[in-house]
Design a protein with these regions (language model features):
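N-terminal carbohydrate-binding accessory modules
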Residues: 21-105, 234, 278, 351-355
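Sec-dependent N-terminal signal peptides
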Residues: 4-13
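Extracellular glycoside hydrolase catalytic/binding regions
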Residues: 55, 87, 160, 166-187, ...
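NAD(P)H-binding glycine-rich loop region in Rossmannoid oxidoreductase-like domains
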Residues: 108
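An active-site-proximal structural segment forming one wall of the substrate-binding cleft
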Residues: 86-105, 116-147, 153-190, 209-221
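Acidic/histidine-rich helix-loop elements
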Residues: 71-94, 115-119, 156-160, 262-265, ...
């Protein structure tokens, strides 16, 4: 009982801190004799290279470039830029290493706690650097609002994921306004992993979740009519079965699945097809996060899964992004910042991203 009391106390404390943080930030904005001049962060970015890369669009069930050619992304997630900068590892060299791994896209996870603590103004500076480096190296970008939980109930898996509907709307207003027209930023992943955690995070129906996403998309489109919103399903962004009867009412979007190996037992393929793969016949689908099993990240434990999932995704025309290019976050892809020795998880991605030996 004591453990649960501590857990709920932490949630209440973090929620109060979140609300207090919003109030403090609001007060800081008006601590000026010319308070009427204060504006919200995220004014449109001015980047002469914004159109350097081809604009990615949705055409039927595919992502295509400006020539109409189908694009299948092989992406790689980095850790949160705030974490990396605090550790002294935020640099152009990091993105060069990601490029060398074979990635054509970088997924950037923005945690709500980091967004608040650094402040949106300062966090945008990190994102601007990332977009600049990715443009130079010809890698596209997903900006991911990296929360896990029930956005409707306001209950989340861990304190770092605590956010609110208001903050989520404000985040996407800020991001869409700032990166509108920048072709490198191809995708906005609206919410990382919606989950009810077997009822421990309250209740939310698909219809309620669909409506939240539709409202976010409308807000994004008020500022940015080109970048592609990505919508996740329940079960930690794995399950897309509601698309069978009630897809999101929006054009030019994609859907997300996170098909980690623990989600289903063998035989995998028919279960993947039933749970999310079927959707790729009608809509663009992007497996934006998965990797080797947590705590068992060896080829011996994951080799068969790895080759099977990549083969399945690519035959289905589903773009994918591996998790995570970091030596601390699991499943890690290299051992340390000192020597960058790849783990089996890292070696596998590099081989897969380069198309496997023929």
């Amino acid at each position: 009982m004591k453990k649960y009391l501590i857990f709920f106390s932490l949630i209440i404390l973090c929620s109060c801190n979140h609300l207090a943080g919003q109030e403090i930030r609001s007060n800081e904005l008006i601590k000026t004799t010319k308070w009427w001049t204060v504006q919200f962060p995220g004014k449109p970015q001015k980047d002469e290279n914004a159109k350097l890369m081809s604009l990615i669009k949705v055409k039927g069930n595919r992502f295509v470039n400006s020539n109409g050619d189908t694009v299948l992304f092989r992406g790689l997630a980095i850790a949160d830029p705030d974490k990396l900068e605090n550790e002294g590892e935020w640099s152009k060299e990091l993105f060069q290493r990601v490029k060398e791994m074979g990635a054509t896209l970088v997924r950037i996870p923005v945690h709500p706690v980091a967004w608040r603590q650094r402040t949106p103004e300062k966090y945008l500076e990190l994102l601007d650097q990332a977009i600049g480096w990715c443009t130079e190296m010809r890698m596209y970008v997903i900006i991911d609002w990296h929360s896990i939980g029930n956005l409707k109930a306001g209950l989340f898996q861990d304190p770092m994921y605590i956010t609110s509907l208001t903050e989520t709307f404000d985040f996407w207003r800020t991001i869409a306004r700032h990166f509108n027209g920048h072709n490198t930023v191809a995708f906005y992943e609206i919410f990382n992993e919606p989950t009810l955690y077997f009822g421990q995070l309250g209740s939310m129906t698909w219809d309620e979740w669909k409506k939240i996403n539709e409202d976010v998309i409308k807000l994004i489109r008020a500022f940015d009519k080109e970048t592609i919103p990505l919508v996740a399903g329940f079960d930690w962004a794995y399950d897309l079965t509601p698309l069978n009867y009630d897809p999101v009412n929006a054009e030019g979007i994609g859907y997300v699945s996170h098909p980690y190996p623990h989600k289903r037992t063998q035989p995998w393929v028919p279960k993947w097809e039933e749970d999310f793969g079927f959707a790729a016949g009608k809509y663009p689908v992007f497996a934006t996060e998965f990797g080797f099993t947590l705590g068992k990240s060896t080829m011996a434990d994951n080799g068969e899964y790895g080759k099977t999932i990549i083969k399945y995704l690519e035959e289905r025309g589903i773009s994918w992004a591996w998790w995570v290019f970091d030596p601390a976050w699991e499943p890690k892809m290299f051992e340390s910042w000192n020597d960058h020795t790849l783990t089996d998880n890292g070696k596998f991605f590099k081989e897969a991203a380069h198309g496997f030996p023929k």
